[in-house]
Amino acid sequence: MSSKIKIDDLANPLLTEFQQATKDFGETLKLELTSEAIINEAFKNSGLQDFGDEDFISRLDVLMRSVSNDEGLAGIGKLGVFNDQVRYLENRLKFEKFKKKFPEYHQEIISQPIIIIGLPRSGTTHLLNLIASDSRLKSIPYWESLRPFQEKLIDLENEKDLRQEEAFKEYESFLQTMPLLKSMHDMHPNHIHEEIELQAMDFSTYLPEWLAHVPEWRDYYLSHDQVNHYQYLKDVLKAMQFIRGPKKWVLKSPQHLEQIPALIKTFPDATFAITYRDPLSVVLSTATMLSYGCLLYTSPSPRDPQISR
C-alpha cells in the first residue's frame, strides 16, 4: 500500500532550484498573446497555410484576450498556453492537408462508441484505461492526442515519425517541473487519454479553464451551442480511424458532463458510462491539483479565490 503524500507549502510555495529557474526564465519572455502571433507561429512551424474554415479565429481572439487579462498568470504559464494553441493550430493545418489527400476518410462510420463521462477527479481516466485494455477497442494514447497526424502520411518532409519521442521529452520536462503531478494525474505518453486535445483543434472547450483564470472565455464557451464543435471532433475521429483501426471507440472527457445534449446528438448510438464520486472529495482533489499547478504557473503565489470559484 502506497504512503500518502502531504503537500504543506501550497500557501507559501517552496520551489526547487529547477522550478525557480524555470519560473524566472518565464518572466524574461516577451510573448504576444494574440491570434495573429499564434497563427504566424503555426504557419512557420508547419510550413502549411490552409486552415479550411477559419471561423475558429473569432473564438481564438476571445480566448487570447481572456488569457491576456489574467494578471496572475506567470510568464511560464503564458508560454504554456501560447505553445498549446500553436500546437492545436499545427494539428488543424495537418488535418486539412490530410482531408485533401484522403477525402475517402469521410466514409468512415463511428459506430456505437463507449463514452465515459463524469466529474473531474472521479476516476474517469482509470476507467478509460481499464476498458481500453481490450484490444478490440480503439482509444487514444496521450502521445497521439498531442499530434494526431504523422507528417510523412501527409507528404511533409519529416520521414521519421517523431511524435512519441517528442512526447517523452515533454514528459521528462514535466516531471522535473511538477514532479507530484505524476501522483495526481500521470500524463505518461503511453497512457490512454481523453479526446479533449482533438476538440481543442476547433477552439471551443473548457480546457483553458484548467490553465488560466479566464471567466470571459468560460462565459463565451458556455453561451454557445457546441454541436458543430462535437461534429468536428467526430470528423477527426473518422480520420484517425481511417489511418488505424479497430473501429469501435472508447472515449472520455469530464467536459462531456456539461455538454450531454451535444454529445448525444453527435453520437446517438453511444453507450455511456458515468462515474460517481462524492462531490466534496472531487472539489478537494481538484483544488489540491490546481493549487499545486499554481506554484509554477501563477505569480506571485497561488490564487485561492479563483481556485475556490
Q: In which residue ranges do the predicted regions lie?
A:
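Glycine-rich phosphate-binding P-loop
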Residues: 116-132
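Post-Walker A helix-loop "phosphate-sensing" segment adjacent to the P-loop in P-loop NTPases
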Residues: 134-142
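PAPS-dependent sulfation machinery
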Residues: 146-249
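Extreme N-terminal, non-catalytic leader segments
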Residues: 69-111
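Long, basic/Gly/Ser/Thr-rich N-terminal segments
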Residues: 2-79
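ATP-dependent NMP and nucleoside kinases share a basic, alpha-helical "lid"
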Residues: 255-274
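Conserved phosphate-donor/acceptor-positioning beta-strand/loop module used by diverse small-molecule
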Residues: 269-287
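Conserved small/polar residues in nucleotide/adenosyl-binding loops
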Residues: 297-302
